[in-house]
Regions:
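N-terminal secretory signal peptides and thylakoid transit peptides that target proteins
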Residues: 1-17
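A generic secondary-structure signal for well-formed alpha-helical elements
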Residues: 14, 18, 86, 90-98, ...
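C-terminal segment of N-terminal export signals and the immediately downstream linker at the start
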Residues: 21-66
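Short helix-capping/linker segments at secondary-structure and domain boundaries
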Residues: 23, 138-147, 224-229
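All-alpha RGS (Regulator of G-protein Signaling) helical domain and cognate RGS-like helical scaffolds
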Residues: 49, 69, 81, 92-102, ...
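Mature N-terminal segment immediately following signal peptide/propeptide cleavage
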Residues: 53-85
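An amphipathic alpha-helical core segment
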Residues: 171-226, 234-243
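N-terminal targeting pre-sequences for secretion and organelle import
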Residues: 231-255
């Protein structure tokens, strides 16, 4: 499979709910407002910036801090084992390539179409896993409740109400076939949308800024919830740090 086919698969796999969009392009094929050489900041601004050689970011809370929604054992395995594995394999893939390892992981996945073919699969899968999980940990915390301020207004404007948004994101997350993620994203034009990505694909690859992400890989919930993904997704909303999510939304608006 060549690079063009690989990127086309990622673009085709992003399922948007409540919006019909296309990735805007200039006549020369470069992206407008996306993550290209002159636009990558719009996505990276909404995330932290772990740089290479890549390291596992510490959890910003204790393993048991999200009980009873996420159990301590799952959090330990999810962070220390699964996420660490993505970091290790990404480092192995970019070893000896300072042109790659000097870039943030978000920059790598945002510019996947510019990656060397030899490293493309590893950056897509392992880099995506590192980027997605680094983002996830920052948006969880004791909280629940509901968003406020500008994010609440944007959600109401797009989805009608917070409860309607919850229903749509839940349906998207529960409906992912196999492993993947459900996302609330900010599109290049500023509109919110819900989309899903398979495996560890990132919204950044298609120029979308992640605001909130639900990991529906079984390793995220199977120890506690077994095959009851709907119960896990319901519990997820009680573990969202809406202040952190609102900050990412605000950062995305500035970029």
């Amino acid at each position: 499979m060549n690079r063009r086919m690989a990127i086309q698969q990622i673009t085709a796999s992003a399922v948007l709910l409540g919006a019909t969009t296309a990735r805007a392009s200039r006549a020369d094929g470069s992206r407008i407002g996306g993550a290209g050489s002159d636009g990558r900041g719009a996505q990276a601004a909404a995330t932290a910036t772990p740089t290479g050689p890549y390291t596992l970011p510490p959890l910003p809370y204790a393993y048991d801090a999200l009980e009873p929604y996420f159990d301590a054992e799952t959090m330990h395995l999810h962070h220390d084992k699964h996420h660490q594995s993505y970091v290790d394999k990404l480092n192995a893939a970019v070893e000896g390539h300072p042109d790659l390892s000097s870039r943030t992981v978000y920059d790598l996945v945002a510019n996947l179409d510019a990656m060397p073919m030899a490293q493309l699969a590893a950056i897509r899968n392992q880099g995506g896993g590192h980027a997605n999980h680094s983002f996830l940990w920052e948006t969880l915390g004791k909280g629940g409740a509901a968003p406020s301020g500008e994010l609440a207004k944007a959600i109401d404007a797009k989805f009608g109400s917070f409860s309607s948004f919850q229903e749509k994101l839940t349906a998207a997350a529960v409906g992912v076939f196999g492993s993947g993620w459900a996302w609330l994203v900010r599109l290049p034009g500023g509109v919110l949308a819900i989309e899903t990505t398979p495996n560890q694909d990132s919204p950044l690859t298609v120029g979308h800024t992640p605001v909130l992400g639900v990991d529906v890989w079984e390793h995220a919930y199977y120890l506690k919830y077994k095959n009851k993904r709907p119960d896990y997704v319901k519990a997820y909303f009680s573990a969202v740090n809406w202040d952190a999510v609102s900050a990412k939304f605000a950062d995305g608006k500035k970029a």
